[in-house]
Design a protein with these regions (language model features):
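Regulatory N- and C-terminal appendages and interdomain linkers associated
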Residues: 1-142
Length: 142
């Protein structure tokens, strides 16, 4: 499994290899075969990206331009239920500090933000939360 917000955030840096992308993998690719497949995919993606052109010109995208465009549409931080639930719980006791903290972060989801924010909120979901309804994923009642 892959954490797609982290995956696309890392991919938006247009990495030279798959090492940064591995931050988004829930299970580390243990086999050389898996690393090889991801590496081949990244090469193909970069070739396709190199062959695409800027909408406003016929010139190909530069890596820098592609990275900039991807970072505009792929937030680094997203509101996740497993971050929100503790904030709800604290708020029921009139402690809104975590709600405010999340609000500050999510109002700038594309920004790099501080090292502390990155360590706390730019990470994979803990494995113990995988099968807990309401924490593992958002629910939809529609």
């Amino acid at each position: 499994p892959v954490d797609y917000p982290i995956f696309f955030s890392e991919l938006s840096m247009v990495p030279d290899d798959i090492v940064p992308l591995k931050k988004s993998f829930y299970e580390s690719p243990t086999s050389e075969g898996m690393d090889k497949r991801w590496s081949e995919w990244l090469i193909k993606w970069k070739l396709l990206s190199d062959s695409s052109t800027n909408v406003n010109t016929t010139a190909p995208h530069s890596c820098k331009e592609l990275s900039k465009q991807m970072r505009l549409v792929n937030p680094k931080y997203s509101l996740r239920e497993w971050f929100v639930m503790p904030a709800y719980q604290q708020a029921t006791e009139r402690n809104y500090s975590l709600v405010r903290e999340l609000q500050d972060i999510i109002t700038q989801p594309y920004a790099e933000q501080s090292k502390d924010v990155k360590e706390k909120y730019y990470r994979l979901k803990p494995s113990e939360l995988f099968d807990i309804g309401g924490l593992s994923q958002y629910s939809c009642s529609s």
